[in-house]
């Protein structure tokens, strides 16, 4: 029998996405500092945070991820408050931006262990938003705990005009790439088990 996968995240979206793969999960959120370091490139940032989360949580097989919206080289994490969400949405309005997710799988099955990771990028084109749309959306509360202040799988999806790449990446976890990392780490996926 395969070990249960430990998800080092409190994100309900990641839990739901992994549920789509039929994986049994133990959820153990990692307590890590998610601030961007001065001069840290966005790809390095999401990978560093994902690795730190995976290393902070015990378990035989641990999966961690970190997602950021990137506009003009600036990492847009979760907004601090409603005004910060408005600022982010104004900045994203009418632009193309990138959503990056760093994914790390750590397996402690041997003395050496295995750590595999990847960064997945998805390009998103956002509609032009007026103040009324932004105020309404912020008023729903939905953007307040989302990287970049929007949820493609929620009401924020109405503002997305085009997606190039993994849609599940924009939600918070690139499923195809995550399944490939788990497989490479020797973690059997449900359809591979006898």
Swiss-Prot record:
Q: Which GO terms describe its biological process?
A: nucleotide metabolic process
Give the residues annotated as active site: 66
* Top-level EC class: hydrolase
> Which molecular function GO terms apply here?
dTTP diphosphatase activity; UTP diphosphatase activity
- Tell me the cofactors it needs: a divalent metal cation
Q: Write down the EC number.
A: 3.6.1.9
What keywords does the record list, in alphabetical order?
A: Cytoplasm, Hydrolase, Nucleotide metabolism
The site feature described as Important for substrate specificity is recorded at 13, 67, 153
The main location is cytoplasm
Q: Which reaction does it catalyse?
A: dTTP + H2O = dTMP + diphosphate + H(+); UTP + H2O = UMP + diphosphate + H(+)
Record-linked PANTHER family: BIFUNCTIONAL DTTP/UTP PYROPHOSPHATASE/METHYLTRANSFERASE PROTEIN-RELATED, BIFUNCTIONAL DTTP_UTP PYROPHOSPHATASE_METHYLTRANSFERASE PROTEIN-RELATED
Query: What's its job?
Result: Nucleoside triphosphate pyrophosphatase that hydrolyzes dTTP and UTP. May have a dual role in cell division arrest and in preventing the incorporation of modified nucleotides into cellular nucleic acids.
The name under which this protein is listed is: dTTP/UTP pyrophosphatase
Q: Which organism is it from?
A: Anaeromyxobacter dehalogenans (strain 2CP-C)
């Amino acid at each position: 029998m395969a070990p249960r996968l430990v998800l080092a995240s409190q994100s309900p979206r990641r839990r739901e996405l992994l549920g789509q793969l039929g994986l049994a999960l133990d959820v153990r959120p990692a307590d890590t500092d998610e601030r961007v370091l001065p001069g840290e490139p966005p790809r390095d940032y999401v990978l560093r945070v994902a690795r730190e989360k995976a290393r902070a949580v015990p378990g035989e097989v641990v999966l961690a991820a970190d997602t950021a919206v990137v506009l003009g080289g600036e990492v847009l994490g979760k907004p601090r408050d409603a005004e910060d969400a408005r600022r982010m949405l104004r900045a994203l309005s009418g632009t193309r931006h990138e959503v990056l997710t760093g994914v790390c799988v750590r397996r402690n099955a041997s003395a050496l262990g295995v750590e595999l990771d990847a960064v997945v990028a998805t390009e998103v084109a956002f509609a032009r938003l007026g103040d009324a749309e932004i105020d309404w959306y912020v008023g729903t509360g939905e953007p307040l705990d989302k990287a970049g202040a929007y949820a493609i799988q929620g009401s924020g999806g109405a503002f997305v005009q085009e997606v190039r790449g993994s849609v599940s990446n924009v939600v918070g976890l690139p499923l195809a790439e995550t399944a490939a990392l788990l497989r490479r780490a020797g973690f059997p996926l449900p359809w591979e088990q006898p």
